[in-house]
Structure formats: structure tokens, C-alpha cells
Regions:
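Metal-associated gating/positioning segment near the N- to mid-region
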Residues: 1-28, 35, 332
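Divalent metal-coordination and catalytic microenvironments
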Residues: 11, 44, 103, 132, ...
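Metal-coordinating catalytic core of metallo-dependent amide/deamination hydrolases
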Residues: 23-171
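Glycine-enriched alpha-helix->loop->beta-strand junction motifs that scaffold or abut catalytic
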Residues: 122-128, 160-163, 180-189, 210-215, ...
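Catalytic core of soluble alpha/beta enzymes
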Residues: 133-186, 194-207, 221-230
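His/Asp/Glu-enriched, well-ordered alpha-helical/loop segment
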Residues: 157-160, 206-290
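C-terminal cap of metal-dependent C-N hydrolases
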Residues: 280-331
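Intein/HINT protein-splicing elements and their conserved insertion hotspots or analogous self-processing inserts
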Residues: 327-346
Length: 346
């Protein structure tokens, strides 16, 4: 709940939640398969943030390696067990306004190829499908050794990638993969703060954008949960990598905001991108009175928000037309959070 509160306070209006914990501490399946799903749905409902709840299939500890004991809480024994979890999650989502079902596997290294293809076919076709791909160089090397293809290369050759799919990170792609992913209609979900923290690498964004690729931003490990900061880091890393200042074409701030919103609407399955008459209003409201913004021409404001702004300038958010002021967490909610963390650690 605290995480979702902080995400909304900093400008997020929706979250795609990768739900990994399918079993109790000892690895025993929950009596109610959707136990953790319900907890997440209730947290999102309390905060008033939209959620695409995505149970994640994870079967092995790496290419050709069995799962470890430490992974016992999120391992699916087989496809049938995972599909039952999807159905339970779908039923739970139906009871909460502002929620929808997503599906996915962790990555090619976490499932075998046949199971991945079966999950793609066997899950609701209107549910967005997520997976990690080409996050780290070692992953790419092991994929080539096992499947005789790079991760994105394999996905392009063996799945019908489309706007249904979101590939998280996709950092280490060669040019043919970059162009193929861009032309597929799938979305690349970029998480700059996490990718920097883990030392993953830099996504080939300039080539991808030039080829018409769709993208969105994510927070992954939640080391950073400020959407403006994620866009600024994305731009900054590209500048460092390419030695150029024109990461985004045209009005860079406007382009970055609009494209990330469009990609995000595809990734979360809402397809609610931008402001449209009759549509529920999901928006972040920034202060117009701050020194950096108040004296600017309207044409310069979007770029200023991306390059020199952040969560401190967020006044509040609209989610489904309901406005909430951005306020620091109350002492009561902080105390409740501390108790929960202490209980978790005990």
C-alpha cells in the first residue's frame, strides 16, 4: 500500500504489478490461489491507482537449471498450475474497479520454450503479455548456447509478437533485433533507474525510435518511482552513450511524455492514451507557479518538466476522474508501514 501511495504521489496513475509470490513461506501453495493477488488489489483500491495484475510464470533457475530452494515461493510446477492461477487472478480482478488482468512469464531463462508458447496460446488473448528479455549479457550468451539464438531473436522467430506483448528491458539487442522488435508492434518497457542500479546497460533507443518502435517506462525494482526522473535518466543515458543531445525528435519533452504514455497504455492493456472527450481522466498535475515553469513559453514547458523537474512539482493526480492531492505520507501510515516491515523481517 505504501509503495502504491508513493507511486501515485509522484505522478503514476497506473501500475503493472508483476506478481511473483504464489506460495507461502515454506513453498506450500496458498489455499486460495489468488491470496496475494487479492492483497495487491486491495492495496491498489485503497490508494486509488489503476492496476494490471500480472501473475508471472517462473519454472526454473536458469537455462537448463532447476529452481533453487530460495525460489520456492514463486515457482509454477507446470503450465496447468499457472493457468489455474491466471483464472483465479482473473476472477479476483473482476471484483475490483480499476483493475485488469495481465499475464506473462519471467523470461526465456525461467521457462522452457514449449511452455512459453503454450502459455501464450492458453491465456486470455485480450490480456497484455509481459516478459523480460536480453536484460544482461550473460543471459544473452546462455540463451545463444541453449536455444541457438539471442533472446529477442528467438522471440521474433517463434512468437507472433504484436501490440499484446511488452518486453521489459530488451537492453542487449543487435541491429536486426532492434528493427524487428520495432516493426512487430510490441512495446519495450524501459526501466532506467533499475537498469543503472544493476549495471545492465543502455537500450538502443535512437535506432529503435527511428524504426518506429513503441516504448514505455517502468520502475521494476522500485529503486526509483518517479516517472519524470525515469524519463530524464533515459534521456541522459542516451546522451552519454551516443555523445548527442537529440535523443527525442521534435519537441523532446512533448515527444517523451506522449510516447511513454501511449506505450504505457498498451502495456497495461487500458489503451487509454492521452486526453479524449468522454474518456476517464488519468493525468498528473504539475505546479505552474514554480520559478522554472511560470516564466516559460508553453512550448518549452514539457522539456523543462523532463530535464529540470520531478516529484516535488507534482500537485496531484487524476485517476478515473478522481483527484488526489500529492501529500507526504501521514505519520499513521508510516507507522503502519514500519510495523508491516518489522513483521515481515521477524
Amino acid at each position: 500500500t505504501m509503495l502504491y501511495k508513493e507511486m501515485r504521489r509522484r505522478g503514476f496513475t497506473s501500475v503493472v504489478e508483476f506478481q511473483y509470490l504464489h506460495h507461502d513461506k515454506d513453498g506450500t501453495p496458498y489455499a486460495e490461489a489468488a491470496t496475494m493477488a487479492i492483497a495487491l488489489l486491495e492495496a491498489a483500491a485503497e490508494v486509488g491507482i489503476k492496476i494490471t495484475l500480472t501473475p508471472v510464470m517462473y519454472c526454473q533457475g536458469g537455462f537448463g537449471r532447476p529452481a533453487t530452494e530460495r525460489q520456492r515461493r514463486f515457482i509454477s510446477k507446470n503450465v496447468d498450475e499457472y493457468l489455474r492461477l491466471v483464472e483465479a487472478t482473473k476472477d479476483a480482478c473482476a471484483k475490483y474497479s480499476g483493475s485488469r488482468l495481465g499475464v506473462g512469464v519471467h523470461s526465456l531463462r525461467a521457462v522452457n520454450p514449449e511452455d512459453l508458447q503454450e502459455v501464450v496460446r492458453g491465456t486470455p488473448q485480450d490480456a497484455p503479455f509481459h516478459l523480460h528479455a536480453s536484460e544482461q549479457i550473460k543471459e544473452v550468451e546462455e540463451c545463444v548456447a541453449t536455444l541457438r539464438a539471442r533472446p529477442v531473436e528467438w522471440l521474433l522467430s517463434n512468437l507472433e509478437l504484436s501490440s499484446r506483448f511488452s518486453l521489459v528491458h530488451a537492453t542487449h539487442m543487435i541491429e536486426s533485433e532492434t528493427l524487428g522488435l520495432a516493426q512487430s508492434g510490441a512495446v519495450a518497457v524501459l526501466c532506467p533507474s533499475t537498469e543503472a542500479s544493476l549495471g545492465d546497460g543502455v537500450f538502443p533507443l535512437r535506432k529503435y525510435i527511428s524504426a518506429g518502435g513503441r516504448w514505455s517506462i517502468g520502475t521494476d525494482s522500485h529503486i526509483g518511482i518517479d516517472p519524470v526522473e525515469e524519463l530524464r535518466l533515459l534521456d541522459s543515458f542516451q546522451r552519454l552513450e551516443t555523445h548527442r543531445r537529440d535523443t527525442f525528435p521534435g519537441d523532446p519533452g512533448r515527444f517523451a511524455i506522449l510516447e511513454s504514455v501511449r506505450g504505457g497504455a498498451s502495456s497495461d492493456g487500458s489503451l487509454n492514451a492521452g486526453l479524449r472527450i468522454g474518456a476517464a481522466l488519468d493525468a498528473c498535475v504539475f505546479k505552474a507557479s514554480t520559478p522554472l515553469v511560470s516564466e516559460l513559453r508553453s512550448a518549452d514547458r514539457a522539456s523543462t518538466l523532463i530535464l529540470a523537474s520531478g516529484a516535488a512539482e507534482v500537485m496531484g493526480t487524476f485517476v478515473g476522474g478522481n483527484y488526489k492531492t500529492a501529500e507526504p505520507p501521514s505519520s499513521e501510515s508510516v507507522a503502519e508501514f514500519s510495523r508491516a516491515v518489522q513483521k515481515f523481517r521477524s
